[in-house]
Amino acid sequence: MLDSALRQSLETAWEQTLRQLGDETVLRFTHNSIPFAAYIPERVARQTQMQDIAHLDSPFYHSALQIAIPTIKQIRYLWDALGYNAAAIEDDAQLLKPSIQGDSEILTVPGVFAQQADRIIVGEGTQIAPCVVLDARKGAIIIGRNVEIQPHVSIVGPCFIDDDVLIKAGTRMYEGTSLGIASKVAGEIKNTIFQGFGNKQHDGCLGYSFIGEWVNLGAGTDVSDLKNNYSTIRVRFSHDKAREISTGKTSLGLLAGDHTKSAINTSFNTGTVTGVSANVFDRAPDKYVSSFSWGGQPDSPFFEEEKAIELARTVMSRRKRELLAEEELLLRNEYKRSTKNDE
């Protein structure tokens, strides 16, 4: 909690900045109504010399970080995040490298093949087995703390691997991939974002996909990310095919909501969307799978609400996590929305 003097200093600084910038539009970021950052367009910065804003010379602001943003990247849909992910990893590597006290010596262990090791960041407690290739020639590789990388793994940057991740033997990970905290992966993965606690521990191809938290992809689950005719991929967020929208992309795989699960040998079509807590066991599911679907087709029944909540608790407890009351409320609200829309 900020004391009143500090809060007043922040408010005063913001008011002074606005007065000196005049009527130009700037973007303020706040937490509990307290400003902690501001985005000032480049043209405004050129017109108003930032060093001329007197109060910024105060020692109070010397620890502030000024970041030049050449362009604004707008993320309207999840596939936009996939398009920016590789560049974002590179940016993160530049910011993280000076501050991380990692374990670079592990890259010199016999049997670990690191290409352009100066672009690889390894956190403390991470274990890398023999016969692992870390190829950072195309981009940085960021590996968090207490990660386990088993033998015969190949990782091509730019890639991000969060803390406590398990990468199983024989995994092939390609550029633009991010693995969230405590995820467990195997098989082939490219240009994919895993949120935390994802589970893909068996062979299967996954590319150009966004995978929510607590998702489990069964053995042999494969995802198509390119149409046979190489045309632009269209997606929909309901069963109404007339409401499909164009992604403008020729490569897009699976967009999977939290707690979604697929059975063994499931094959997802190009640009498939699944809602929250969907259970997909039809080997060729529809391109849109409702939240809490029990099967994966438009006419599939819904998973029972109480069983879905209890399953979420069970899955999370296996990773020593608890389903918060707020999370349970979100799941119940989504259940009401989904079942109502299907009536």
Question: Across the structure, where does each feature detected by a protein language model lie?
Answer:
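Terminal amphipathic alpha-helical/low-complexity segments used for targeting or macromolecular assembly
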Residues: 1-115, 286-288, 292-343
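A broadly conserved detector of short glycine/acidic/proline-rich loop/turn motifs that flank catalytic sites
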Residues: 6, 33, 41-42, 79, ...
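Short, functional N-terminal and low-complexity linear motifs
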Residues: 48-60, 112-113, 132-134, 150-151, ...
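Surface-exposed beta-strand edges and their flanking turn/coil or helix-capping segments
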Residues: 50-53, 87-90, 96-98, 126, ...
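Extended beta-solenoid/beta-helix repeat architectures
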Residues: 101-117, 121-212, 228, 255, ...
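Glycine-rich hexapeptide-repeat left-handed beta-helix
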Residues: 169-170, 175-342
